[in-house]
UniProtKB/Swiss-Prot annotation:
Organism placement in taxonomy: Bacteria, Bacillati, Actinomycetota, Actinomycetes, Mycobacteriales
A Pfam family reported for this protein in Swiss-Prot or TrEMBL: AA_permease_2
Source species of the chain: Mycobacterium bovis (strain ATCC BAA-935 / AF2122/97)
Family per similarity comment: Belongs to the amino acid-polyamine-organocation (APC) superfamily.
Identification of the protein by name: Uncharacterized transporter Mb2022c
Cited function: Probable amino-acid or metabolite transport protein.
Record keyword Transmembrane present: yes
Amino acid sequence: MRRPLDPRDIPDELRRRLGLLDAVVIGLGSMIGAGIFAALAPAAYAAGSGLLLGLAVAAVVAYCNAISSARLAARYPASGGTYVYGRMRLGDFWGYLAGWGFVVGKTASCAAMALTVGFYVWPAQAHAVAVAVVVALTAVNYAGIQKSAWLTRSIVAVVLVVLTAVVVAAYGSGAADPARLDIGVDAHVWGMLQAAGLLFFAFAGYARIATLGEEVRDPARTIPRAIPLALGITLAVYALVAVAVIAVLGPQRLARAAAPLSEAMRVAGVNWLIPVVQIGAAVAALGSLLALILGVSRTTLAMARDRHLPRWLAAVHPRFKVPFRAELVVGAVVAALAATADIRGAIGFSSFGVLVYYAIANASALTLGLDEGRPRRLIPLVGLIGCVVLAFALPLSSVAAGAAVLGVGVAAYGVRRIITRRARQTDSGDTQRSGHPSAT
């Protein structure tokens, strides 16, 4: 087991500018947009009237992951999140697998969020809008983390105002019927687990807080407080909105709705709120994308430092103190995906990768000693088992695609190890021959 990271051991340190509020807001910006506007309808399709139970399962697993991640982040306050924790606690391979799952899965999620903005702002040119948004937000991140935190705070405020209006309008209308919240015969365990897996994709934004370990002031104190706060606020928002929308639409109509919050306002007779909801959805997806690009670039930075990705990606800008090459490459890849990808496929693939990422986080937390801040063993154990179960409860196409891409990463890791081993053997042989010249 490796010793804790010392900041002096980390080359090209990033600037610590983020406080508790900034860290919480970055987590909120990552979670609220994805969950309310992207995962609610497919989760209802999977769980039917058991949607709220699926939400509860997702919340329990997310809480366990949050506690494990917070304790690990306090122990290892460096950029990279579970990529760093896995390497330090379980070994290089598991850290690499977590990092690969995060970078690839969240890159797909970035494309999904960019396309969400495009479909709400200009459906006829959704892909073009998505690419433009990616370019703009990459520029914001390139200019410095404080600008990103300020913009994220503004986006979260707008989204919360819109969601509050939706909840008040839904509960205040005559269309809301509490009987629609009852669990019927259509609810079954597998469907609730699948819904929990889809909703967990929405909860996963607190990972972005952990990946910013080098940019948070007093990370040992700030991160363990920020992660549960962000998760708790998000859960409260999800529960209020989900109950309101189900009470108006019912689970079956919710499952069929392309834009469930807009549909709920239409049924409730509050048509003037529909364009406000559409703008809120676009802004929420924008907030998610902003934080996603931020987190993916930081994990790319950490992997590049360890040569699991090309070393030149680890460069930190001398003025802005951000991993500018990693951000530019991530932005370019996301822009390419946004120009060509299907949004549903991107979300499904991302969910599998995120659950694998957190499974490794919980396994890492299980190895912490009591003097290292380990949570009660039940917490990471429930988180680990929950992540594995929810990952394989996802639709078969998502599981197959996720497993295939993770397999590519494992193969790349193995090839790299073989090449490195042979290079070392060659160097060792050359050294021995130079030290023992043959007699002639």
